């Protein structure tokens, strides 16, 4: 069989990531460096490194930022406590929280005010989960996995609703909800799907190429939830092997031994140049035929954060 690449589409940048990265670039143009960013603007080492070279400074907490400095909140969102701390320091805040994450924040606020206890399906410690749960810390409990759904101790069970992190495995989330419903039949669903369109689309594309691939390569960083999920989805849907890497030069040539078909995709925070670099490496290894496998068309564009909206150019 001739060596070939199955290139998943959609892949790479989603609308929220594109918006956040442009926000940092625009802030640097307008205000000049340094511009401070709380946490990584998106979870990709290449993107963060590129922005650092342009003058962005990434910090873990707002108390590391000089008073009055231009500060950007990452795409993953923040809690009200972080907003309060930023205001106390007089920071010039540009909020690059993804609008789809903000939607979940609003759901938390609305349900908690209505007396609901919220089971937030997600990964404890992830910045998005910390920001979301911070909007009602006494009314939110994080459920990390289907197995945890079987045993988690819920203090208030009369009015329950489940919400989720936006970058989870669709299938694993459905399994978690199924198990929660066995214990709490009255648990309410969110008003709309919390897992974002880009996460779902990228997983659907991987499901299409996985059973046809001897190896699936996911370009993405280790701390990128949606990239890690793509590896899991590939393995769960028929790929003989799957790996994640940040850069093409990390690819171990031994992985290509006896491999005829390589599936390629990338996480939602990955610029296309990194995929192109990988395709060049694969071409040199004999994988010159590239077939695009498209499962959806994405044309969503978010407006830039307040204060940066006059131009996206």
From Swiss-Prot:
Keywords: 4Fe-4S, Iron, Iron-sulfur, Isoprene biosynthesis, Metal-binding, Oxidoreductase
Residues at which dimethylallyl diphosphate binds: 43, 76, 126, 224-226, 269
GO terms of molecular function: 4 iron, 4 sulfur cluster binding; 4-hydroxy-3-methylbut-2-enyl diphosphate reductase activity; metal ion binding
Residues the record lists as binding [4Fe-4S] cluster: 14, 98, 196
Pfam families for the chain: LYTB
GO biological process, one term: dimethylallyl diphosphate biosynthetic process
InterPro entries noted in UniProt: LytB/IspH
Catalytic activity: isopentenyl diphosphate + 2 oxidized [2Fe-2S]-[ferredoxin] + H2O = (2E)-4-hydroxy-3-methylbut-2-enyl diphosphate + 2 reduced [2Fe-2S]-[ferredoxin] + 2 H(+); dimethylallyl diphosphate + 2 oxidized [2Fe-2S]-[ferredoxin] + H2O = (2E)-4-hydroxy-3-methylbut-2-enyl diphosphate + 2 reduced [2Fe-2S]-[ferredoxin] + 2 H(+)
Record-listed E.C. numbers: 1.17.7.4
Cofactor note: Binds 1 [4Fe-4S] cluster per subunit.
Pathway note: Isoprenoid biosynthesis; dimethylallyl diphosphate biosynthesis; dimethylallyl diphosphate from (2E)-4-hydroxy-3-methylbutenyl diphosphate: step 1/1; Isoprenoid biosynthesis; isopentenyl diphosphate biosynthesis via DXP pathway; isopentenyl diphosphate from 1-deoxy-D-xylulose 5-phosphate: step 6/6
CDD domains: lytB_ispH
Enzyme superclass (EC): oxidoreductase
Cofactor: [4Fe-4S] cluster
Amino acids binding isopentenyl diphosphate: 43, 76, 126, 224-226, 269
Binding site for (2E)-4-hydroxy-3-methylbut-2-enyl diphosphate: 43, 76, 126, 166, 224-226, 269
Record keyword Iron-sulfur present: yes
Active site per the UniProt annotation: 128 (proton donor)
UniProt keyword Iron-sulfur, yes or no: yes
Function noted in UniProt: Catalyzes the conversion of 1-hydroxy-2-methyl-2-(E)-butenyl 4-diphosphate (HMBPP) into a mixture of isopentenyl diphosphate (IPP) and dimethylallyl diphosphate (DMAPP). Acts in the terminal step of the DOXP/MEP pathway for isoprenoid precursor biosynthesis.
Similarity annotation: Belongs to the IspH family.
Protein name per the record: 4-hydroxy-3-methylbut-2-enyl diphosphate reductase
Organism of provenance: Tropheryma whipplei (strain TW08/27) (Whipple's bacillus)
Gene name of this polypeptide: ispH
């Amino acid at each position: 069989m001739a060596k070939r690449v199955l290139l998943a589409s959609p892949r790479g940048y989603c609308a929220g990531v594109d918006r956040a990265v442009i926000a940092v670039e625009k802030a640097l143009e307008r205000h000049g460096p340094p511009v401070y960013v709380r946490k990584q603007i998106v979870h990709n080492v290449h993107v963060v490194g590129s922005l650092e070279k342009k003058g962005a400074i990434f910090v873990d907490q707002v108390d590391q930022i000089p008073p009055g400095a231009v500060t950007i909140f990452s795409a993953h969102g923040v809690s009200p406590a972080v907003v309060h701390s930023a205001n106390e320091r007089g920071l010039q805040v540009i909020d690059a929280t993804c609008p789809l994450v903000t939607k979940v924040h609003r759901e938390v606020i609305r349900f908690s005010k209505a007396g609901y206890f919220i089971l937030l399906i997600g990964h404890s410690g992830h910045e998005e989960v910390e920001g979301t749960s911070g909007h009602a810390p006494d009314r939110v409990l994080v459920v990390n996995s289907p197995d945890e759904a079987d045993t988690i101790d819920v203090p208030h069970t009369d009015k329950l609703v489940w919400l989720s992190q936006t970058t989870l495995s669709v299938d694993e989330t459905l399994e978690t909800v199924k198990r929660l419903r066995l214990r709490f039949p009255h648990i309410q669903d969110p008003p709309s799907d919390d897992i974002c369109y880009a996460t779902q689309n990228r997983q659907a594309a991987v499901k299409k190429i996985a059973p046809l691939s001897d190896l699936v390569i996911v370009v993405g960083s280790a701390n990128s939830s949606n990239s890690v999920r793509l590896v899991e989805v590939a393995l769960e849907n028929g790929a003989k092997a799957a790996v994640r890497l940040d850069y093409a030069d990390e690819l171990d040539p031994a992985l290509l031994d006896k491999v005829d078909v390589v599936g390629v995709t990338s996480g939602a925070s990955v610029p296309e140049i990194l995929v192109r670099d990988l395709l060049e490496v694969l071409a040199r290894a004999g994988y010159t035929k590239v077939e695009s496998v498209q499962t959806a068309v994405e044309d969503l564009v978010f407006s830039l954060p307040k204060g940066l909206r006059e131009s996206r150019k």
